[in-house]
Amino acid sequence: MTTLYIAQSPIMQDWGADVGISKHLYKVGVTEDAAKDAVAELNAEAYAGHKDWELIGERVVSAVDAAGLAVRLGERQKVIDPLYYPKLKGAKDIVKLDQRKVEANVVIKRTMAGHDSKVPKLKPVDMADYIMDSLGQNSWS
């Protein structure tokens, strides 16, 4: 059972806002174990130089490996280059989201479901759902 998970680091998000990248920075990963265990491992190894990773979303997907995830991620989201931002310490799977795109996606989903089209206040779970939906996890090859 392969699990796709999304994690956030509040300290890294503050750093992203300070340097002008975006405060919406998320780590996208895949694991064969439980997603909580994978996030605990991120904290233990201080992934990207941070020990405050929190799990914000997870989905069980069909077989996918880290290389396949990296390719799909690069095609669909803006992946932050660790060579340009050395503070990321070589982390190659940190994505930057545009809040307006996520808001538009949520509004379209709500409108199609027959709910009001008011722009909601986004939560980390909304960001994680947007990333997982954009990766098209149901069509992994």
Protein language model features and the residues they cover:
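Non-catalytic accessory segments flanking enzymatic or RNA/DNA-binding domains
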Residues: M1-S141
